[in-house]
Regions:
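Short helix/loop segments within enzyme catalytic domains
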Residues: 74-82
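Divalent metal-dependent phosphate-bond-processing catalytic cores, especially two-metal-ion Mg2+/Mn2+ enzymes
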Residues: 4-35, 44, 48, 54-55, ...
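Acidic-and-aromatic substrate-binding clefts and catalytic sites of carbohydrate-active enzymes
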Residues: 58
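An active-site-proximal "capping" alpha-helix that borders the catalytic cofactor pocket
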Residues: 19-27, 61-74
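Short acidic/histidine-centered micro-motifs embedded in hydrophobic/aromatic stretches
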Residues: 41, 82-86
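Alpha-helix N-cap and coil->helix boundary residues
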Residues: 33-39, 62, 78
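Conserved, aromatic- and glycine-enriched, well-ordered alpha/beta core segments
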Residues: 48-53, 64-68
Length: 208
């Protein structure tokens, strides 16, 4: 069984667990996802990993296409585009703007505790690929802090995860208000989370 298939079935892109964390992230970012099409996008956006030999690189980046095709056939081109642009790397390489699904997807990673994320990544065999590629696969112009750089270079997967989650959290903070007016996304008060290790999360007001 290829690593992409394992990731969907019992790895970090597990249909049930990953979908739940994205829904939580979306709620923290934009309010409760009441539109059922959002839930289907949460479920299908990574379906293209099925059968992939690698999670990263050119092969892995095309994983956005299957979910986008399904969403497009069901709900039209706008929803296909919404799903397709959930990958930073795909969007950047095609000159596209990221969608809010991309931001929620990254916050879902940040919210995943190590006792959930690491066993899944080990079970599917994708952990070490992510560790090897994480230092040079981050999109945008941000850089690791000294503490993050030390952590992502650690041989301890727990330290690596802390460093990458910290870096990703800063990216989410910068991009959390990605606009999606064509999908009539939540336009009200969009607060954000005060990230704490495993405790309850407090919503902060949007800066005016």
């Amino acid at each position: 069984m290829r690593v992409g298939t394992k990731s969907i079935l019992f790895g970090v892109h597990n249909f049930v667990i990953h979908t739940a964390f994205i829904a939580l992230a979306w709620r923290r970012l934009y309010g409760f996802p009441r539109d059922p099409r959002l839930w289907l996008a949460f479920l299908l956006h990574d379906a293209g990993y099925f059968g992939k030999r690698l999670m990263e690189g050119r092969e892995g980046e095309t994983h956005v296409e299957l979910g986008a095709r399904i969403m497009g056939r069901l709900f039209g081109a706008e929803w296909a585009d919404f799903c397709r642009r959930h990958s930073r790397y795909y969007a950047r390489s095609h000159g596209l703007r990221i969608s809010r699904l991309c931001v929620a997807d990254k916050l879902a990673f940040v919210l995943s505790p190590s006792w959930v994320y690491l066993p899944l990544a080990r079970a599917s065999g994708e952990l070490w690929e992510y560790i090897d590629r994480s230092k040079d696969r981050q999109a945008g112009n941000e850089y690791f802090t000294a503490a993050e750089w030390s952590q992502v270079n650690s041989k301890d997967p727990r330290e690596w995860l802390k460093g990458l989650q910290s870096f990703t959290y800063r990216w989410v903070l910068k991009n959390r208000f990605a606009d999606e007016p064509d999908l009539r996304a939540h336009r009200g008060h969009a607060g954000f989370v005060d990230r704490r290790r495993y405790g309850p999360m407090r919503l902060l007001p949007k800066k005016q």
